[in-house]
Amino acid sequence: MKMHQLRYIVEIVNQNLNVTEAANALYTSQPGISKQVRLLEDELGLEIFERHGKHIKSITPAGKKIISIARELLVKAQGIRAVADEYTRPNHGVLRIATTNTQARYMLPSVIERFSKKYPDVSLHIHQGSPTQIHDALMSGEVDLAITTEAPYLFDDLVQIPCYWWNRAVIVSPEHPLAKVKELTIEELGKYPLVTYTFGFTGVSDLDYAFNSAGILPNIVFTATDADVIKTYVRLGLGVGIMASMAHTALDTDLVLIDASHLFRPSMTNIAFKHSTFLRNYMYDFMEYFSPHLTRSVVEKAERLRDNNSVKKLFEGIELETK
């Protein structure tokens, strides 16, 4: 059993069982991957994948367990390299972060500017996506840290550290009837077609809770993962926008921002990472730059805790900022 064989079977799963795409991602050949997977299966005496002809159709029950362990082994191997780099090249490396468009566009620029000045030899890679995509990128080892804003239940098996609260706001054109409303109500908002985040109405979200509590079925006409796209379609008159208030800037003079903090419960932005992740010194610094209360000592305490309920208790005495 060799590490590259484990890397191959994990990447096949990452690429939705497409061996050709796995080969492309790993810069190797499809026949080479297929041969190594077969050699691994022969060594183990079982099949990891179910096949139909030459094509992989699914993962066997044993294969699912093997791939889960393989992922952890690859993370640990990556951790060994990180430990070595920490001692031999402490200010060199890579930091890979998965987050939403809103965080990448409106919250991270100042953090990255400060970070890059201190660590010019650390390459930063930002992966943008939905909560599910962010979770999958973290679990597959594509990224080191995840900055999450929705669906915290997806990250229950990971270290999840609270950063700050954020509120939603409503945006409309100056000519829209809601632009003249003194205090917006959920009933009034429910009368109009809505444009909001793609995952804003999946699962038990704060938006779900607000509308369900009022007995209102919202008319969602368009969804997007990008706040800038939401603003574009509001400008086109498609509907009333609901987005993070931080996404409204001084450049959006043609849009009226209406406070909705009294309509929807605030949401939490968290930083998440795997329990098995070896955090480099520059990763601790990044977290503190992003959220000043996340000093190294605080993060290390959170790392030692084995469940997120304990992590929440750790932060009970800390008043988190609201954005």
UniProtKB/Swiss-Prot annotation:
The residues that make up the annotated DNA-binding region are 19-38
Any Pfam family: LysR_substrate
Q: Where in the cell is it found?
A: Cytoplasm
Among the record's GO biological process terms, what is one?
A: cysteine biosynthetic process
Q: Which residues form the HTH lysR-type domain?
A: 1-60
Q: Which GO terms describe its cellular component?
A: cytoplasm
* Keyword field contains Transcription: yes
- Name one molecular function that GO assigns to this entry: DNA-binding transcription factor activity
Q: Which SUPFAM superfamilies does the record cross-reference, listed alphabetically?
A: Periplasmic binding protein-like II (SSF53850), Winged helix' DNA-binding domain (SSF46785)
InterPro entries from the xrefs? CysB_PBP2, LysR_subst-bd, Tscrpt_reg_HTH_LysR, WH-like_DNA-bd_sf, WH_DNA-bd_sf
Q: Where is the signal peptide?
A: none
| Alphabetical keyword list | Activator, Amino-acid biosynthesis, Cysteine biosynthesis, Cytoplasm, DNA-binding, Transcription, Transcription regulation
Q: Does the keyword Iron apply?
A: no
What is this protein for, i.e. what is its function? Answer: This protein is a positive regulator of gene expression for the cysteine regulon. The inducer for CysB is N-acetylserine.
Q: Which family does it belong to?
A: Belongs to the LysR transcriptional regulatory family.
Question: How does this polypeptide assemble, per the annotation?
Answer: Homotetramer.
Return the PANTHER family for the record: HTH-TYPE TRANSCRIPTIONAL REGULATOR (PTHR30126), HTH-TYPE TRANSCRIPTIONAL REGULATOR CYSB-RELATED (PTHR30126:SF6)
Question: What's the protein name?
Answer: HTH-type transcriptional regulator CysB
Q: Which organism is it from?
A: Haemophilus influenzae (strain ATCC 51907 / DSM 11121 / KW20 / Rd)
Organism lineage reads as:
Bacteria, Pseudomonadati, Pseudomonadota, Gammaproteobacteria, Pasteurellales
